[in-house]
Each structure stands twice: as C-alpha cells, then as structure tokens.
Curated annotation (Swiss-Prot):
Bias (Low complexity): 11-21, 351-389, 425-446
Organism: Oryza sativa subsp. indica
Biased composition (Pro residues): 403-412, 447-476
Protein keywords: Chloroplast, Membrane, Plastid, Thylakoid, Transit peptide, Transmembrane, Transmembrane helix
Rhodanese domain segment(s): 140-246
Range of the transit peptide: 1-21, 22-58
Principal subcellular localisation of the protein: plastid
High-level lineage: Eukaryota, Viridiplantae, Streptophyta, Embryophyta, Tracheophyta
Subunit note: Component of high molecular weight thylakoid LFNRs-containing protein complexes containing LIR1, LFNR1, LFNR2, TIC62 and TROL proteins.
Entry's transmembrane regions: 100-120, 264-284, 287-307
Compartments (UniProt record): Plastid, Chloroplast thylakoid membrane
Membrane topology category: Multi-pass membrane protein
Function: Rhodanese domain-containing protein required for anchoring ferredoxin--NADP reductase to the thylakoid membranes and sustaining efficient linear electron flow (LEF).
Protein name stated in the entry: Protein THYLAKOID RHODANESE-LIKE, chloroplastic
C-alpha cells in the first residue's frame, strides 16, 4: 500500500511524515516516447508557469520529486517523461533529448509577444518607412500622395522628387509648428478626399515628418508615413538613387505662384492688370470707341425712358444739330459778321453835332436854335432768326430825303433874331432827346413840322451882325 504524503507550498516546508520511496529510473528509450498530449501539456505548463511565476511560491527539490512521482504513478502507462535536473547540464540534456517540447515552450511564450507587436503596430495609421518603400507605395497605390514639408528655400535650391512614373506631383506644403491649423487647411485644399488618401511625408531630414504623419492621421486622413532620413539624409531619397528633379535655374511661373493658394489671387490679379494695361495702350482707339458707345447707350437709356425726359432730350438734340452741328448758310454767316462788326440796328442815327459857340451868356440862344434834323422813322426790332438784319449805313446822307441835306440858312434881321431867341428859350425848357438813345418801340411818334433852317454862323444872333467888343482895360 502506497504511503500517503502531504505537500505544503510555503517558504519553509514542514518535515515529511514518511520518507520518500526510492523509484527506479526509467530507461532512456521509454523517456523518448512522448505523446502529443504530453507535449501539449508540457507547453501549456510552461506557459502557465511563466504567467503565474510571480504568484506561486518556490518549491523545493524534494517537493518537485514527489510531484513527478505522483504524476508517474497516476498515469500508469508508458509515454511519461522525466523533468530534467535544475542544473545547467540537466536543462541542456532535456533540450537535446526533447527538441519539440523546447520549441513548443518557446513558441508559447514568444507568440503572444510577437502578436502584440504586430497587431499593435498595424493598428497605428502612421509610421516610418524607407525611401524605396515610400516610392513603391506612390507608384502602386492610387490613393498615395507625396507631401513635401520642406521650407520653400530648400525646395528651390535642392529640387524635388520626380513622380512622373506614378503620374503624380509632389505637393509642396511647408510645415510650421506654430501654425498647425493653417497647415491642415492647405492640405484640405489640395486633397479633397482625406478618408481615402494616404500621405507620404518628406522632410529635409527626419525633422518633423513623423510628427506631421501623426498630426494628419489624427485629423481624418487614412494613413501617413514619414520617409526615413528625409530627402538629403544618409538613407534618404537622394541617397537611395530614386528619381529626382534638379532645381530650375531660370524663371518659372510655378515658383512665382507657388503650390499653395495664398499667393494665387494676388499674382493673378497683377497679371490681369498688366495684361489689361497693355491691351488698353495698344488698342486705345478701340477702347475709346467702346467707351463712347457705352456713354451713348447710357444717355439713351436714361433720357428716353420717361416722356418728360424724352421731350426735353429731343429738344436738346434738335437745338444741338440746328445751332452747333448743321452747316450755316451764307446769309447766316454774313449776319453774324455784320452783328460783330457793325452797331446794333436798334440805335437811332443822329446828325452830326456842330461845335459849340464860345461860352458866353449870349451863346445859349444859339445852342437852343440848333434843332435836330428830321428823325428817321424808328425801326421795330425784329427777331434775328426771322429775317437777316439790315446793315447800318455809315453816311448821314441816308437820313435826308433824296440824300440832300438842308441848305445853310441866310442871316436874319434883328427883329426875327429876337423872335427866334424867345422861341429857342421856350424850346430849351423841354427835355431834349438823349444822343444815340435807343428808340421806343411802343408807338411811332407823329411827324414833327419841319424845323427852321439853322444858321451856320453865330453872327446872326447879334444885332447888326456885330458881336460885342472885348472890354478894354481901364486906366490905372
């Protein structure tokens, strides 16, 4: 009858109640015959042992032997295998004798770690790839796009990747760590479908490429990968001998506009203004004709819509064509010349005024007797538009009948001279008409009686035609 033993797992094991029974060592051939269940059990045992090593208390050598004895007695058949000794030689002998068991144990321990690394790395949509892998992805994947985050100066000096094989073009969007929102906005303008776009981030070196890859994937892009060592690194794009476009030495419109959209409106506005200026300079006549036509259309539209404006506009057009544009007839031209050179027809012609006599008291009657010649009939003013104005004659003879002026009067007797003096005084009290005054056109005056002949010599005004003698100075 087998003795019953009690195993206690503790740091200080208790003494055994019965000494262990010596067990014969199984032959080597028997130990090598392993079953599938024994291998699986050993692998699971190693895995569980490794997982719960921190929780289980250490067992002594005697306890390990008792456990192996119990498992061997309970199996009751061949196929069991003996655990190696805890020494280094025993472990090596066990691995050499049981390679499948050792491999299964290592696989059971390493497989969870490998799966965790693989699955954990695949779950992240961003990472770092080599330049060759990045170029291969750009060529093979339709949704892969290259984003060049280098500063504009570096891109102009060094060049850019050549993606003609992939029928794509690198999007130059410089990255500024202080303006992440602006960077994302520029990317959104370049790529309209971020959920299906995989970005390959290229920097000058490793600088900010991985940070940008994480940033863009966190903002809705499918995936992003940073090129290891960037464009100019030791294992970067240039060092991998991938297609590269050398910088352009001449003027390039794409460099002026840039790949971004910030400078596009200003540049296109300047180009449009320059083109319009050149066109206006070369086609100034056509431009003026166009502007004149536009002004005429505006005038017609604003002046002929309403009835009142239409009447007023038509009158202005008629006056313009009749007075300023239409050719004048010869009579109208002569009329304008006569109006400019000759005095107005409304003024009355007056006969020539004789020189006044010496300023003396007796000279007044002589001045009073000087009467005007019969005035010509006043001519009513007529409209200059109705009939052409008659030219004013420069000769005074036209004012007399048959162009004959009155003859010079003969000297009168003293009695008649006194009578004429009284008549001249009475006539002087009346208001004499102003010289060269305009005639009144209300009504034609009655025909005045013919005036007495006016003597041309002052001597008839003195008795016996003798003027008074000058006073002689008195004696002192």
């Amino acid at each position: 009858m087998a003795a019953t033993t009690t195993i206690l797992s503790s740091a200080a094991p208790t003494p055994l109640t019965a000494p262990p029974r010596a067990r014969a060592r199984a032959p080597a051939a028997r130990r090598r015959r392993l079953r599938a269940r024994d291998i699986l059990g050993a692998a699971l045992g190693l895995a569980n042992g490794g997982a719960s090593a921190a929780l289980a208390a250490p067992l002594s050598y005697e306890e390990t032997l008792r456990l192996s004895t119990d498992s061997g007695g309970g199996g009751g058949g061949g196929g069991e295998f003996a655990l190696p000794d805890l020494g280094l030689g025993g472990v090596l002998d066990f691995v050499a004798q049981n390679p499948l068991v050792a491999a299964a144990g290592v696989a059971a321990v390493a497989l969870p770690l490998v799966l965790a690394q693989v699955l954990g790395g695949a779950s992240k949509p961003y990472g770092v790839v080599s330049a060759a892998a990045a170029y291969r992805a750009l060529v093979e994947e339709p949704g892969a796009q290259l984003v060049d985050i280098r500063p504009p100066g570096d891109a102009r000096q060094s060049g850019a990747p050549d993606l003609r094989e992939a029928k794509k073009k690198a999007a130059a969007v410089p990255y500024d760590g202080e303006d992440k929102n602006g960077f994302l906005k520029k990317l959104s303008l370049r790529f309209k479908d971020p959920e299906n776009t995989t970005l390959v981030i290229l920097d000058k070196f490793d600088g900010n490429s991985e940070l940008v890859a994480e940033l863009v994937t966190a903002n809705g892009y499918k995936a992003a990968f940073a090129v290891k060592d960037g464009a100019e690194g030791r294992r970067g794009w240039l060092s991998s001998s991938l297609p590269w476009t050398a910088p352009k030495k001449g003027f390039s419109l794409s460099d002026l506009i840039g790949d971004g959209t910030d400078g596009l409106p200003v540049t296109l506005g300047l180009a449009a203004a320059t083109g319009l200026g050149i066109l206006a300079y070369t086609e100034i006549e056509t431009v003026l004709q166009f502007l004149g036509s536009a002004a005429i259309v505006q005038l017609v539209a604003s002046k002929l819509i309403y009835a009142e404006d239409r009447k007023r506009t038509l009158k202005q057009i008629d006056d313009f064509f009749n007075k300023k544009v239409a050719p004048k007839e010869l009579v109208d031209e002569i009329k304008e010349i006569s109006q400019a050179l000759l005095p107005s027809t409304g003024t009355k012609s007056q006969p020539a005024i004789t020189e006044a006599a010496p300023a003396t008291a007796e000279a007044a009657p002589a001045a009073a007797t000087a009467t005007a010649a019969p005035p010509a009939a006043p001519v009513e003013e007529t409209s200059t538009e109705a009939a052409p104005a008659e030219p004013t004659p420069l000769s005074p003879y036209t004012n007399y009948p048959d162009l004959k002026p009155p003859s010079s009067p003969s000297p009168l007797a003293p009695a008649e001279a006194t009578k004429n003096e009284s008549e001249s005084e009475s006539a002087a009290t009346e208001s004499a008409p102003a010289v060269n005054s305009a005639p009144v056109a209300e009504a034609a005056p009655e025909a005045a009686p013919p005036a007495a002949p006016r003597p041309l010599s002052p001597y008839p005004n003195y008795p016996d035609l003798k003027p008074p003698s000058s006073p002689s100075p008195s004696a002192p």
